[in-house]
Regions:
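C-terminal alpha-helical interaction module
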Residues: 1-328
Length: 328
């Protein structure tokens, strides 16, 4: 893995502290697209929602970027916000725009590397080069590279052109959604990375315990409700979904998160299939990119870069979640 230092690409970097714990850097670009261009919760104003103005840079392998693809699909914004998909291999040059094997290349500028998008926005940028990136074609800059904020923009800022009937962050449920996110993000979404990229036994076991305690908590919650916040699909579900989808094919083996599979949890496994079968979601899933990225890119974890053939997965199989009543 690498990063930019004063606008120059450095290909050697590893994100662990003195105790061997994986440390995720905060996202640096935190502006918001709003319906009228007024400033959002953070950053500057001037980013008005307009069809055709914004572009997403994503990886089909990345769970954080996958969130944005799901919201783009469900909110019917495919003709409003364009997209470029990076290659699944993350090597010495970071994310690349090699246009093969399901990757699109850089459909805006024809660049070779994602880090060139970052330096196009800020020639002296220092920090990691991550996906997703929400790009403003008009101002030629990065609006935001924090997935949790991008999905909230997609949820409401473009309702004039998308499906305004869907609201995954409704006002009356926000407190509970935020509370669920505060459990799921550190323990599960980031927890698998904390286990997988740990460089000490102590750090690995700490992350491992926290991860499976949180999964047990969510499993119990889903025994009482169809979704994480009652009987209504919300942002909290989609934030968890992208991690659950990758758990059995990647995190169990590659990140050593092997106490139990999602398939071993009755409620979580049925819930995962339920979400996968929401119209529009399956089209955002690329298991080939997911598996080849993790197993092929992380040489420190998998030096031979052999990609497992299994497991057999059928996310389209029937589920039992319809036993819960629907939200009024």
């Amino acid at each position: 893995m690498g990063l930019l230092v004063d606008g120059k690409w450095q290909d050697k970097w590893y994100a662990s502290d003195a105790r061997g714990r994986f440390v995720r850097q905060d996202s640096k670009f935190r502006n918001w697209v709003t319906p009228d261009g007024a400033p959002g919760p953070t950053g500057d104003g001037g980013f008005k929602a307009e069809p055709g103005r914004y572009h997403l840079y994503v990886s089909s392998a990345c769970p954080w970027a996958h969130r944005t693809l799901i919201f783009r699909a469900l909110k019917r914004l495919e003709d409003v916000i364009s997209v470029s998909v990076v290659h699944h291999y993350l090597g010495a040059d970071g994310w690349t725009f090699v246009a093969e094997d399901g990757a699109t290349g850089d459909t805006l500028y024809g660049l070779d590397y994602l880090h060139q998008i970052y330096t196009r926005a800020d020639p002296g940028h220092s920090g990691r080069v991550t996906v997703p990136v929400l790009w403003d074609k008009k101002r030629e800059t990065i609006v935001n590279n924090e997935s949790a904020e991008i999905i909230r923009m997609l949820n409401s800022a473009f309702d004039e052109w998308g499906d305004a009937t869907l609201d995954f962050y409704p006002q009356r449920l926000r407190e509970e959604i935020d509370r669920i996110n505060a459990l799921v993000y550190p323990a599960i979404n980031n927890g698998v990375y904390r286990a997988g990229f740990a460089t000490s036994q102590e750090a690995y076991e700490e992350a491992f315990r926290t991860l499976f305690e949180a999964l047990d908590t969510v499993e119990e919650r889903l025994s009482r409700h169809r979704y994480l916040v009652g009987e209504r699909l919300t942002e909290a579900d989609w934030r968890l979904f992208t991690t659950l989808l990758r758990f059995d094919p990647v995190y169990v083996g590659h990140f050593k998160c092997n106490l139990r599979r999602i398939a071993d949890y009755p409620n979580l496994s049925n819930y995962l299939r339920d979400l996968y079968q929401v119209p529009g979601v399956a089209g955002t899933v690329n298991l080939h990119h997911i598996k080849t990225h993790y197993y092929g890119s992380h040489e420190s974890i998998n030096p031979a870069r052999i990609v497992p053939v299994g497991p057999e997965l059928d996310y389209a199989a029937p589920h039992d979640r319809a036993r819960f009543r629907k939200a009024a």
